[in-house]
Each structure stands twice: as C-alpha cells, then as structure tokens.
Design a protein with these regions (language model features):
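Secretory targeting and sorting signals
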Residues: 2-39
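Aromatic- and carboxylate-enriched substrate-binding clefts and catalytic-loop regions
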Residues: 356-501
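Gly-Asp-aromatic-enriched flexible segments
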Residues: 760-918
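Carbohydrate-binding surface patches
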Residues: 557-595, 633-636
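Long beta-sheet-rich domains in secretory-pathway and surface-associated proteins
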Residues: 651-768
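C-terminal beta-strand-rich structural cap/linker in extracellular carbohydrate-active enzymes
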Residues: 615-651
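An acidic-aromatic substrate-binding cleft motif
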Residues: 276-351
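N-terminal accessory beta-strand-rich subdomains and adjacent acidic, glycine-rich linkers
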Residues: 49-300
C-alpha cells in the first residue's frame, strides 16, 4: 500500500514538472536545484528559468522534504515527503487580491536560500529553552499582469511551512487563497468541526469521510474544520495548523468537500482582509513526523515573531484554584473566595482565579487578604468590557492599583481580522501594565506565547466545563495541546457522575501543558483526596523538557486509547497517563530518565481510591500500571539517593503576620495634614528577611503627598515590632469623601529563589468633610449589589463588567451624572452626618425600549425609609425623588424589580446628588 501511494505521489510531482518543461521546450534539463547547498542569507536572488520543480529539505537532510512545482498553467503545488515516502500530495498554492490573481499564470523570477537558526527562551510551554534550525527558500514569481508574489518555504526536522509575501507598498486587500493540503482519502483523521469557540467535539474518521463527523456545520457538500487537524498517512502523522497570525490578517480554517482529498484554507467568515503593504501572510503549517515528533514540536512558536517584551521578570507561570467550575455562583461570594485563597495559601498555589460575578466593592479587600498570604489574584473579564482603549485604560489602571496580577478574558469567539486587531491591542496594553493574561472563549494559539510571553494560557478547546469525555482527553494530547498552552481546567475530583477515574483526573495537568493551570475542584473536594493533594503541591507550571512515552490517538490492539507523556522540571520527571476504554495495564518505557537509579512514585486507582506506591528503577525499565476503566496514573521520578523515600520538595508558605494602622481612620480638610502610624509583627516562626514598610505614594490621588521615611529591617525575628509613622497632605481642591491611603509591608518569601516578595497591606481611610453639592457617583461605596454586572457611575447599566454602559437617558433627557443599576440593586454611601438633602431624577433607562419596571427607595440609618416611588415603567418620564437626610451617616439607594423579575430593569438615578454643609 505504501509503495503504491509513493508511486502515485512521484507520478503526480513528475507529471506537474514534465508538463511545465515540455511547454517551455526544456525537457533536456534534468537537474533539479536543491536548497541543500549553503547560500549566505545576504546572497542576491538568482533566476532559475529552467527550473519548474524545486526541493527544500530539512537542515539535516534526514527526513523531511518539501517539493514546490510549477505546472504548464503557471499554477503552484507543494508536496511533502518524509524519509522519501509521500505524506502530503501536491496541493495548490496561490493568493488573490482585489487587484491581482496570483494563483495562475506564474513564472519564477528569483530564488534565495538561507538557513534560519534561532534560540529563544519562553516563559511557559513544553520546553522553556528553545533552539530551532530551519531551511528557508524564498521563491519570487511574477504573475500574468506583472505583479510579484513571494512564496517562502521553511522545512525543519518537525515540519514544513509556507507563507506568501506581497511587496506592494499601499494597502493590500486579500480576497482569498488557493492554499490546499492534499491528504489521501483513506488516511486516518482526527477532526474538529469548525466553530469560532473551538469547543466542538473531535471525531476519528478518515480524510475523505470527515464530512460525516458533524453535518450540521456543513453547507451543501462542503464542511469546515478547525485547526489543528491531525492525519495519519502510512505511519507518519501530519498536524495542520497556522502560525504568526495577527491583526494584519484573519484566522483561517479548512474547508473540505465530501470524499475529496483536498483541505482548502478558508479565511474567517469568507471575508477579505486588508493590511498595509508589504504583507507577509500567516504560515500555513504542517507538523510532520512520529508521535514523538508531534508531542515535542515547537514549530508553531519557532515560526512566530520574537518576544516584544524585554523584561519578563514579572511573568510567573503557576497553579490557581478556581471556584466557578464546581459552583458557578461562588465568584460573587466574598467569603467563599476567601476560602479558596486560604486553600491556595496552605498548599503553595501561586494564584486564586476569581471568575464572573466578582464585585468591585470587595475585590481590593480580597486582594489584600490574598497577598498577605503569598497568593496573587487573577480576575475574569468579559471582553465586551475591554473592547475599547478607554475601557482597557480605565480597568487596567484600576485593577493594578488593587494589586491584581492578571486577567482572564472571555467570549471573543471570532477569527475575524478585527478580532485579531483587538488581540494586538490588549496584548500590547497588558504588556505595558505588567498584567498576565489568559484568553478564554478564544481562538487557538498560533505562536503568540513567544511574541507576547505574558500569555499564560488559551482555551480554544472543549474543556471540563463542557462535560467529560475520556476519548476527547486522549485526542487533545495529540491535537490541540501540541500547538500551545491549553486552559482545560482539570482535576474536578468531586464532580457528580464523573466518567473518568480519579487517577485519570490527576494525570491531566501533566498530560496537558498550561502556563496557568486552573484546578477545577473546591477545597472540600481536594481535602477528600489527600494523595492527589500531595501530588498537585509538587506540580510545576512550566517545563524544561517534554517527551512522548506511549499511546496514540487511535485505538490500541486491546481496544482502548492511551496517552502517556513525561515532562521534566529540573531533575524531576512528572509522568501522566490517561486511558479511554475498559481498562488494562498501561505501560510507560522509562528510557527518558537517563543514567543511574531513579525513585518513582506512582499514583493509581485501587478500589475506587488513589493509592501511592514507591519503587526504584532505571531507564531500562518499563513502568506497568493497572488502570481502571477510563483510568490513568500520575508518576513522579527523581534521582535515587541513600535514605531518600520520596521525591517531594518542601511546600513553603507565607507565615501569618499582622499589620495594624493607628488610627485606621483620620479626618482632614482639603489642603490640611493628617498623621498616622503602623505596626508590623511576625507572631511566630523563622525571622523574616528584607522587610520594608512604606506608604505607596504612587497610589495617592493627584495633589496628595506623604512625608515620612520608609522603615526597613534586614531581619525581623518573631515577636519584634516594626513601626513607622507618616503625614499626608490632602490636595487643596479635594472634594469631600474618603480616600484610602495604602500602607505596604514587603518581605522576601521564605521559599526564596524567584518567588516574588510577600505583600502585606492595610489602608488608612482619610476622610475629607463633605461640603456643598456632592454627586453620589463621585463617592466611594460602602457596599454594592446589582441584578446584573456592577452598579455603573455616570452611565446606564451595561454588561457583566464595568464602565460598559451608555449615557443615562430617561424620557429622552440625558443626565451627565448619576448611577445606573439593574434591579434589584443597591449602594450604600457614607454621608458623615454632614448632608441635609438628597435629590435625583429616577426612571427606567430608554435603552430598554419601553420594557422594564422598577421601584426606587431611599433609606437612612438603620434602613429607615426616607423616600420611595411607585412602580415606574419603561417609557415613563423621569420622576423627581427627594429626601431629607439631615444627620444621616449611611445613605442607602435601592432599586427594586417592580415585582416581575429583573429583565430590562435598568434603573437610572439621574443627577443623584446631595446638599451638604459648607
């Protein structure tokens, strides 16, 4: 079969070549130029008028070759062979713009060869230190109308890629590509019906019959499939994807006609893309080789532009606990989020991720609580709240002031050029603000983690939130996770009706790579699995080396599917094995371990529980682990030493400390001074190192200043107090209200190394007397709740995030100041007992188009009602609402839902203001 396929491949290439030669009267030319000869990068382009087929080989000339051929019609085709055997048959190349058709009528006018050698370092991924060598040939063609087309072909030991170069100086509009990959119809295929979420289920089929996988995604006889798409051709694996996509282009996918061998590149939404010229398109990429080659491939990153972030010291991969998966309502519960912070602190996790539902009113307090315990906070955002530059500027500066270190951004669901332009913008902004980022509801990674190393992970996968499927788990190890970090959210041990075993679940964060690994269970679920807890405490988030061990996406001879991968961090190897099927013995040859004797801890299923065993092995041994149905195992190997009984490294956590301010609240008029002190203590434990206490002057409002020296201690033993004192000067034009002045203590984390210092913070609330006219939207909230998203200041209620509303509008009147709620909503404001009157124009915002019903209530101290409206409906004119607030300290403004639920209940408090003492 293989020999027949090779003959078909050879005849196809020769046929294209001879046709072109005959048309040019050049049949006597028998030598095919090869890029194997070294040509300096600076060598001028040379014309090869006699050539119509050219070979580019991998630098070692050992396995892969790409063969580019030009036929009699001037059409280009590219074929790929491995070890002389065909892998991809000749597939069309070419590109169309609104000015030129560069898919036919082409002739070669130049060629340039070079070897690309690149070394770089990643912050995440399967291998931190990278080295890539690729053979590159740039072919220059001229079209029938005189336009020039560059085709750049690169071949490495793990794949082949090509891109188009258009050297036009003005804007270039690409209307489509002729690019196709030709795969034998009977080749095994693992495909994913295309969806912009990349959350479709993968299916095993054949290349020709792939359209039967999910006919609902098809139009007529053509179906679309998302990257990466995997094929097996006579023992060689081919993973098709793309690399180096940014806002100059759109993402693409593969279109396939039923029964055909061609998989054609289609631009997102079948829309043209326009870019400033000259234009280099994304790389059309095929990772080619054995499963070992695929698992270890870094080709997608190798093809991406170098890092645009010079200083990466602030970027830290790690593990986070995450409450949303096990309880979707929990991110809105401050106390529950503290539980997750406590768990992270106790088990050495770097982060807590707070998902959809968090409240701006309590996030700063949660961040202070977490940082004092050595845990950093990641916040979820709906991308609708970060779409514009103004939104990003406002939110990023705010959360940086809170102490948030990263964001998880959700719901992009698009491969359009405009979306990639948004990716460019938010990546630039997060790099400038030193915010790490995880893209959820996103496209797949196409090398962006090399260019933007603050990208910790990307979803682009049907993950845990979409149910369980052990077969899917195996497929993903050989498809999606090959091309970049994958936010799969593993380890939900307590999941009801779990379909895989405990050991399968534990193995997933080793089988899958992610710069941020979001653990899916809750503290109680983890506590019920102490063996798993111990293993997860040791788990790194970035790797020095990754190896394929055994298994594959296809069924084994015994009927099950397996994936076993090994990843190294320092001198320790972590091994994860997962199985889809009835169970059996999983085998892991240990040749990757190297010389000497090794200690191996193995965690596997036994009688429905996790059991840990320890043994000594060498690289000649094979680990054999009995596996349950849909089971697996997790192992940890380290060099054996006398007296060593495990591979654990210490889990070092931040100690409990106290930071108290005295007083915690002070009053100062505009332009006046206020003084306060602070005391920091370590009650017990080993002495702290490099301790510093200061006022964070960078977070003071404009016009404020702070006097007083920082207080430092090289060593602070338990029981000894560190004291400081400062005086702040209030800005002369400071309006009434309360400003939080942060007092910060930092000290070296006991773990040492590159672990960031522990940050302990308390705030002194400096209260400036309210005077004159005071707008409610300018005051800090003592508390806040809302029916949907946050309460908005000076705009109507928007989406799930903040600052995404529209101008407050009731009955056609626009109000520049006020509050926007979605009933039921409420805010509490400190009046200091200095105000006498509250007034506002209230009603349902016009954006509801006549829908919605709301009540408005004003409450004083002890929730005493001061004023209220009847039920107001959408389309009603604004109603004046006034209340006597003389002597009131806490004012509460409440919007009720009118008794019929909260839909469309956008409650506006137009020009909500107070009259206070002068």
């Amino acid at each position: 079969m293989r020999r027949k396929r090779y003959e078909r491949f050879r005849r196809a290439v020769i046929g294209v070549t001879l046709s072109a030669l005959a048309s040019g009267g050049l049949l006597a030319a028998t030598t095919t130029p090869s890029t194997a000869a070294t040509t300096p990068p600076s060598a001028p382009a040379t014309s090869h008028p006699s050539a119509s087929a050219w070979t580019v080989s991998d630098p070692a000339r050992s396995a892969l070759t790409a063969r580019l051929a030009l036929d009699a019609a001037g059409e280009l085709r590219l074929a790929v062979a491995r070890g002389g055997e065909p892998v991809l048959s000749p597939g069309r190349l070419g590109i169309r713009t609104d000015q030129h058709d560069l898919t036919t009528g082409l002739r070669l006018i130049g060629r340039k060869d070079r070897t690309v050698h690149d070394t770089y370092r990643m912050t995440t991924g399967k291998e931190l230190r990278r080295s890539a060598t690729m053979r590159e040939t740039t072919f220059t063609f001229r079209g029938a109308d005189g336009a020039r087309l560059g085709v750049v072909v690169r071949v490495s030991d793990d794949g082949v890629a090509y891109r188009y170069v258009l050297d036009e100086r003005g804007p270039v509009t690409v209307t489509g590509e002729a690019s196709t990959f030709e795969v034998p119809a009977d080749a095994k295929a693992w495909v994913q019906p295309y969806a912009t979420s990349y959350e479709s289920e993968r299916t095993e089929t054949t290349a020709g019959a792939a359209n039967a996988a999910e006919p609902r995604t098809c139009a007529d006889d053509t179906c679309s499939f998302g990257y990466p798409t995997l094929f097996e051709v006579d023992g060689s694996y081919v993973l098709l994807t793309e690399a180096d996509v940014d806002g100059r282009y759109s993402g693409s996918h593969l279109d396939h006609k039923d029964g055909a061998t061609a998989y054609s590149v289609a631009l997102a939404d079948d829309e043209p893309v326009t870019s400033p010229g000259p234009l280099s398109t994304p790389w059309r990429t095929a990772i080619v080789g054995s499963l070992d080659t695929l698992v270890g491939s870094t080709l997608v990153d190798d093809l991406a532009p170098p890092s645009r972030v010079r200083d990466t010291s602030w970027i830290r991969p790690g593990t986070d606990d995450w409450s949303w998966l096990s309880d979707t309502n929990s991110p809105g519960d401050f106390d529950r989020q503290r539980d997750f912070v406590d768990y992270a602190a106790a088990h050495g996790l770097e982060y807590t991720l707070v998902d959809a539902g968090w409240k701006a009113s309590w996030v700063p307090e949660l961040v202070r609580y977490a940082r004092a315990r050595g845990v950093d906070v990641i916040l979820w955002f709906d991308w609708a709240d970060l779409k514009t530059q103004a939104q990003r500027d406002a939110w990023f500066s705010k959360i940086k002031a809170w102490g948030v270190v990263g964001v998880k951004v959700d719901y992009m669901y698009s491969d359009a050029q405009s979306t990639f332009q948004w990716y460019d913008a938010i990546l630039r902004d997060t790099a400038e603000q030193h915010l790490m980022i995880d893209f959820h509801g996103a496209t797949i990674p196409r090398g962006l983690q090399r260019t933007w190393p603050q990208v910790m992970s990307v979803e682009g996968v049907r993950g845990k939130e979409n149910g369980q499927n052990p077969t899917r788990d195996v497929f993903l190890a050989f498809t999606r996770n090959i091309v970049g970090s994958m936010d799969y959210t593993p380890t939900w041990f307590s999941r009801p009706n779990r379909q895989n075993s405990l050991a399968h679940e534990l193995a997933l964060p080793v089988v899958y790579e992610s710069g941020w690994t979001s653990l899916g269970d809750n503290p109680e679920g983890f506590a019920a699995q102490p063996v798993a807890e111990r293993y997860l405490e040791q788990l790194p988030a970035a790797w020095d080396e990754t190896r394929f061990v055994s298994g594959g996406p296809g069924q084994q001879s015994t009927g099950e599917r397996q994936a076993v991968l090994a990843r190294r961090s320092g001198d320790r190897w972590f091994v994860g094995g997962i199985l889809a099927g009835t169970g059996g013995t999983m085998k892991a040859p240990l040749g990757f371990l190297g010389k000497g004797t090794w200690l191996v801890e193995t965690v596997a299923d036994q009688d429905g529980q996790l059991r840990r065993t320890v043994r000594t092995v060498t690289a000649k041994d094979t680990l054999a682990v009995p596996a349950a149905a849909n089971g697996g195992f997790a192992a940890l190997a380290c060099p054996a030493a006398k007296g060593r009984t495990d591979c654990d490294q210490p889990v070092t956590t931040a100690p409990a400390t106290t930071l108290a301010t005295d007083p915690s609240t002070v009053t100062a008029e505009a332009g006046k001074k206020a003084s306060f002190g602070a005391t920091f203590t370590l009650p017990e434990g080993a002495a702290l190192r490099d301790v510093r206490m200061t006022v964070d002057r960078g977070r003071l409002p404009a016009g404020w200043s702070a006097a007083g020296a920082d207080v430092r201690a090289r060593s602070l033993p338990a029981g000894k107090e560190l004291k400081g004192r400062w005086t702040v000067t209030v800005a002369g034009d400071q309006p009434g209200g309360t400003v939080e002045v942060p007092v910060v203590v930092t000290y070296a984390h006991p773990a040492g190394g590159s672990t960031p210092p522990v940050h302990v913070e308390e705030v002194v609330r400096v209260s400036t007397p309210l005077h004159g006219t005071v707008y409610a939207s300018d005051q800090p909230f003592l508390g806040e709740s809302n029916g949907f998203g946050p309460v908005e200041r000076d705009q109507s209620n928007g989406e799930a995030g903040g600052q995404d509303g529209k101008p407050l509008t009731i009955g056609g009147t626009v109000y520049a100041k006020g509050l926007g709620m979605n009933a039921p909503g409420q805010v509490r404001i400190d009046l200091q007992g200095r105000c006498t009157r509250f007034e506002a124009h209230v009603g349902v915002d016009d954006e509801t188009d006549g829908k919605g019903s709301v009540t408005f209530t004003v409450l004083g101290d002890d929730d005493r009602q001061l004023a209220a409206t009847d039920v107001l409906h959408g389309g009603d004119p604004a109603q004046p609402l006034t209340a006597d607030v003389t002597g009131v300290h806490t004012l509460t403004l409440t919007a009720g839902d009118g008794g019929d639920g909260k839909n469309y209940d956008h409650a506006d408090w137009g020009l909500a203001r107070l009259t206070c003492a002068d």
